[in-house]
Amino acid sequence: MTLKEHKTVHEAQNAVARQAPEHFYKSQPSRGGFIKDISEYERLYKQSIEDPETFFSEKARELLHWDAPFSKVSYGSLEQGDVAWFLNGKLNASYNCVDRHAFANPDKPAIIYEADDEKDNYTITFGELLRRVSKVAGILKSWGVKKGDTVAIYLPMIPEAIIAMLAVVRLGAIHSVVFAGFSAGSLKDRVVDAGSKVVITCDEGRRGGKTVHLKKIVDEGLNGVDQVSRILVFKRTGTEGIPMKAGRDFWLHEEADKRRSYLPPVPCDAEDPLFLLYTSGSTGSPKGIVHTTGGYLLGAAMTTKYVFDVHPEDVFFTAGDVGWITGHTYALYGPLLLGVPTICFESTPAYPDYGRYWRIVERHKATHFYVAPTAMRLIKRVGEAEISKYDLSSLRVLGSVGEPISPELWEWYNEKIGNNNCVVCDTFWQTESGSHLIAPMAGAIPTKPGSTTLPFFGIDACIIDPVSGVEIEGNDVEGVLAVKSPWPSMARSVWNDHVRYVDTYMKPYPGYYFTGDGAGRDHDGYYWIRGRVDDVVNVSGHRLSTAEIEACLVNHENISETAVVGINDELTGQAVIAFVSLKEGYLQNDAPEGDAEHITPSNLRRELILQVRGEIGPFASPKCIILVRDLPKTRSGKIMRRVLRKIASNEADQLGDLSTLANADVVPAIISACENQFFAEKK
């Protein structure tokens, strides 16, 4: 049914669909096996929705090596939360990413390492990758790691992170990568929840010219965690004096010398877990998202091939970290499944200067560049002059990931980086989806600046009215984005908490998968992503739970209550703003330095930011902490965050209906506090 009250997708009215530029087609190595135009996409998409059994069985056999064939393509339903794909089929992820390419073309580059210091760059071939993966797998096997065990990986974006992941799954074990920017406490929470007995890390990391003391963080986080019996440590910097606990800590290079150069992979059931990846949840506690082997690998391979138009001769550059899903799917699994070199980038776009990305593209003749809008906003603001110094003509496809990209930034990206010669693929997907949900297929689907265009094969996308829960038919509608049927790469569960999985994704709208994002579908059926509709903030493409940040802040002994909201930010997409009310009599504006009983506002803010950095990580730090007397609440005691979000967005004249507030009198004081503590500092 079409609901008249739903707004039209206004920004789409003047957006013109664009065909791929001529340069894109001329620079393609070949067209065999790819989608040639939108009519072919529509035909195949229709088949993928109406006859998924035939469609996905053909693709699974084409793109993956199976040790034993699957007997049934799919089973289960969204409503029951019991989805399974490729039942009884057996395969190994490490074999599919490494062995088959090493046997066919051992000297072909597999991992192109771009180190923090460019003097440390090197390349690993598929043949060498097989040897190194086998040796690390041999170490883990000697320690008793077996099929179904979890192994935690706390490494920066270096080849050893990819090698460790592939070594774990070679044994049929489950990797749980923890982003190396997370604090000791966050690492501990994830290691304990996953039940990991082995942790893989390094002595130190290097990022932006700075040293990150990773082994020290691991030691702090795992202090008293008796379940961890072994820690494998890669020597990244070689700094002397790294503490090593006898019987628990072992150097990777010393242990690798004891192992054979080839270890056979363990065949896994298609539904065996491949990895856990913790993501922010609206309840505050991180969720260990479970992805399984067969379906996830197919999603990674298919989307990399068809969305990005990837050919064997290409070089793929994902400027993302394996600590997040983008690094998993499009820096590791997608490219390596297709036998394509992947660039492993350890540093930042600003180190040693803003030409770093473009030197990488020029040096390795990268054909694909995939990055979050945050990085492009930064370069647009302060690093644009560097772009023209480099030859970027090898690029054919530009990707955007992690958050919606504005039409203006899309145009800049297309013109300045692509020289109007590339296809820009704005992709929408999630940790839970495993691979792209909605994205243009380069060269086949015309693009529109600001739109993620059309659903990928098998993604039966729809728009739901958030009030009635009824699907909204037709075009030019707005609502909540959902998916009507299962797809191979979707997450299967939350680790040790399947009820939470069903409650979070399947129960909000029974019979549908709830993405948590709002969206519009324009007059052409193209999708426009609006952002989160739940209590999750997207900062620089990283999803952060507002509840987790609130729980961290309220741990401060003199904080009474706190509410965290996300607002639009020119650089990071969204920014974290924290409203904090204090216990009576705690704060004193004129407290003398060193006063033990009171604290100044600036000192308190500093304390709270350090608390967030220490407990969660620097990337979760609030942009501003606003101290208030009280928070706006309904008569049932619920904090009205939409009011705080409007105030922090400088939209106090658009607060809407406040009749349900029990303490509407606090609103003017909050507006004043925001004026003095946030807006005044921005001027």
Swiss-Prot record:
SUPFAM superfamilies: Acetyl-CoA synthetase-like. Transmembrane segments: none annotated. Pfam families: ACAS_N, AMP-binding, AMP-binding_C. Its EC number is 6.2.1.1. Disulfide bonds: none annotated. Gene3D superfamilies: 3.30.300.30, N-terminal domain of ligase-like (3.40.50.12780). CoA binds at R207, G208, G209, K210, T326, S540, R613. It catalyses: acetate + ATP + CoA = acetyl-CoA + AMP + diphosphate. The keyword Nucleotidyltransferase does not apply. GO terms for molecular function: acetate-CoA ligase activity; acid-ammonia (or amide) ligase activity; AMP binding; ATP binding. GO terms for biological process: acetyl-CoA biosynthetic process from acetate. The keyword Ubl conjugation does not apply. One of its GO terms (cellular component) is cytosol. Keywords: ATP-binding, Ligase, Nucleotide-binding. PROSITE patterns: AMP_BINDING. InterPro entries: Ac_CoA_lig, ACAS_N, AMP-bd_C, AMP-bd_C_sf, AMP-binding_CS, AMP-dep_synth/lig_dom, ANL_N_sf. ATP binds at G402, E403, P404, D426, T427, F428, W429, Q430, T431, D517, R532, R543. Belongs to the ATP-dependent AMP-binding enzyme family. This is Acetyl-coenzyme A synthetase 2. It comes from Candida glabrata (strain ATCC 2001 / BCRC 20586 / JCM 3761 / NBRC 0622 / NRRL Y-65 / CBS 138) (Yeast).
